[in-house]
Each structure stands twice: as structure tokens, then as C-alpha cells.
UniProtKB/Swiss-Prot annotation:
<feature type="binding site">
    <location>
        <position position="216"/>
    </location>
    <ligand>
        <name>chlorophyll a 5</name>
    </ligand>
</feature>
<dbReference type="GO" id="GO:0016168">
    <property type="term" value="F:chlorophyll binding"/>
</dbReference>
<dbReference type="GO" id="GO:0009523">
    <property type="term" value="C:photosystem II"/>
</dbReference>
<feature type="transit peptide" description="Chloroplast">
    <location>
        <begin position="1"/>
        <end position="37"/>
    </location>
</feature>
<feature type="binding site">
    <location>
        <position position="168"/>
    </location>
    <ligand>
        <name>chlorophyll b 5</name>
    </ligand>
</feature>
<feature type="transmembrane region" description="Helical">
    <location>
        <begin position="103"/>
        <end position="123"/>
    </location>
</feature>
<dbReference type="GO" id="GO:0046872">
    <property type="term" value="F:metal ion binding"/>
</dbReference>
<keyword id="KW-0934">Plastid</keyword>
<feature type="binding site">
    <location>
        <position position="258"/>
    </location>
    <ligand>
        <name>chlorophyll a 6</name>
    </ligand>
</feature>
<comment type="similarity">
    <text>Belongs to the light-harvesting chlorophyll a/b-binding (LHC) protein family.</text>
</comment>
<feature type="binding site">
    <location>
        <position position="107"/>
    </location>
    <ligand>
        <name>chlorophyll b 2</name>
    </ligand>
</feature>
<feature type="binding site" description="axial binding residue">
    <location>
        <position position="176"/>
    </location>
    <ligand>
        <name>chlorophyll b 3</name>
    </ligand>
</feature>
<feature type="transmembrane region" description="Helical">
    <location>
        <begin position="223"/>
        <end position="243"/>
    </location>
</feature>
<feature type="modified residue" description="N2-acetylarginine">
    <location>
        <position position="38"/>
    </location>
</feature>
<feature type="binding site">
    <location>
        <position position="160"/>
    </location>
    <ligand>
        <name>chlorophyll b 3</name>
    </ligand>
</feature>
<keyword id="KW-0602">Photosynthesis</keyword>
<keyword id="KW-0472">Membrane</keyword>
Length: 269
């Protein structure tokens, strides 16, 4: 009788991670357990043994001439070269937030840089699809005729900046919401690298290769952010696209360079 009683108690008292739960656990308990599991998976170290990009012996910002890294920069995450003069990563919460912002901005910058250069490259090689210079193409929506996507009026003919804004907010917001919320069932444990349908090519299947791809993504993303900043400055100063500016510089580097434009730049002209 005692044995059957204890066995029925064991069956009616499920456990989660070694902790006994009630028969009808509250949503708060399950939510806390799910959050704990997601948090532990998110903060799991990605450093791989023998990788030159992770760990205490990783590549530093000045190579062999680098000073001692701050104690909080352990080489656990990609893109950590042991340099943080301003102490932006000292607080773990701030570091986690800034790390996410950097990765997301890197991805947008890489897409943006490609979008600024590729149409102009095609146009200079005989492919015609309307305005090719990135900032001039976007401004066409304010013209009387509106903006034709890819120069084709039958594709998307945009005449309202508010409609474009609303469409982007809905489409981009839906994807971002899916990523941040961890998917409809909470199956995504790392919102920065969600995998699944966000990785149709299976690039994250090999942990070693995936760890290296994270470093490559950040390195290229940081370059892309600097590139986008340069494209903005070029657009303001010269009124030309990046490839046209490059061609002008190569044709006459003495008169077409950053110094000559900086000394002769007059705002509004």
C-alpha cells in the first residue's frame, strides 16, 4: 500500500531540471523555466579550442604589440580583439545590448552597401533600370511621377512615402518580432543567430565553421558601417554615387580626394 502510494505520488509530481512541480503549475513557473533555459543557451560560450579568434590567446587589436586586455574581455564572443578604451563593455547588461545592436547594424550596413554600389555598377555596364545612384533613386518618390521599382512601372509604382514607411514597418517588424520573441513556440534560443528558417543553407551546422563565420560577419559588417558613413558624406559633399566618386578619384587623384573636397566644400552648393 505504501509502495503504491509513493509511486502514485511520483507519477503525479513531475519534475523539471530536478525541481518538483505542482500538478497544475502556474504559467509564471513555466515561463520562468523557459526563460532560464533560453538564457543559459544564449550565454553559452561559442569559443572553440584552437581558434585564433577566441579565448585568451586570440588575435588582438595591435597583434603582438597589444597591451593587456580588460578583464571583462575574455574572448568569449566573436569580434573581441581586447580593445575597449571607453569601457563600453564593462557592464554585462550594456555589453549584451551593444553586442546585439552591432550585429544587427552590421547586417543592415552590408545590405545597404551592396544596394548602394550594385545598381550603379550595373548602370555603368549598360543595364538600364531607372535612376542608379542610391540617394537619387529614393528621392524620386517625392517627384510628380513617383518611384518605379527597378525602373519598371508595372512592378511597384510608389507615390506615397507614408505607404512605403508603413509597408517596411509591417514587413521588417514582423521578422524582427519573430526573431526577438524566439519564434511562435519559443524554439529560438539565440535571437542573434536564430537558425532554422533563417539559415536555409545550414551554415551553422558545423560549430567550428559557424564560430569563424560569426567573426567574418562582424569584420565585414564593421567595414560596411564605415562604408555607409562614407557614402553619406560623399552624397552630401559631391552629390555623386560611390562608383562615380571612385572613377573621378582614379582619373585625377590630385584634385579629387577627401582633402580637396573638405577645403572647398560649401554647404548648400
Amino acid at each position: 500500500m505504501a509502495a503504491s502510494s509513493s509511486s502514485s505520488m511520483a507519477l503525479s509530481s513531475p519534475t523539471l531540471a530536478g525541481k518538483q512541480l505542482k500538478l497544475n503549475p502556474s504559467s509564471q513557473e513555466l515561463g520562468a523555466a523557459r526563460f532560464t533555459m533560453r538564457k543559459s543557451a544564449t550565454t553559452k560560450k561559442v569559443a572553440s579550442s584552437g581558434s585564433p579568434w577566441y579565448g585568451p590567446d586570440r588575435v588582438k587589436y595591435l597583434g603582438p604589440f597589444s597591451g593587456e586586455s580588460p578583464s571583462y574581455l575574455t574572448g568569449e564572443f566573436p569580434g573581441d580583439y581586447g580593445w575597449d578604451t571607453a569601457g563600453l563593455s564593462a557592464d554585462p547588461e550594456t555589453f549584451s545590448k551593444n553586442r546585439e545592436l552591432e550585429v544587427i547594424h552590421s547586417r543592415w550596413a552590408m545590405l545597404g552597401a551592396l544596394g548602394c554600389v550594385f545598381p550603379e555598377l550595373l548602370s555603368r555596364n549598360g543595364v538600364k533600370f531607372g535612376e542608379a545612384v542610391w540617394f537619387k533613386a529614393g528621392s524620386q518618390i517625392f517627384s510628380e511621377g513617383g518611384l518605379d521599382y527597378l525602373g519598371n512601372p508595372s512592378l511597384v509604382h510608389a507615390q506615397s512615402i507614408l505607404a512605403i514607411w508603413a509597408t517596411q514597418v509591417i514587413l521588417m517588424g514582423a521578422v524582427e518580432g519573430y526573431r526577438i520573441a524566439g519564434g511562435p513556440l519559443g524554439e529560438v534560443v539565440d535571437p542573434l543567430y536564430p537558425g532554422g528558417s533563417f539559415d536555409p543553407l545550414g551554415l551553422a551546422d558545423d560549430p567550428e565553421a559557424f564560430a569563424e563565420l560569426k567573426v567574418k560577419e562582424l569584420k565585414n559588417g564593421r567595414l560596411a558601417m564605415f562604408s555607409m558613413f562614407g557614402f553619406f558624406v560623399q552624397a552630401i559633399v559631391t552629390g555623386k554615387g560611390p562608383l562615380e566618386n571612385l572613377a573621378d578619384h582614379l582619373a585625377d587623384p590630385v584634385n579629387n580626394n577627401a582633402w580637396s573636397y573638405a577645403t572647398n566644400f560649401v554647404p548648400g552648393k
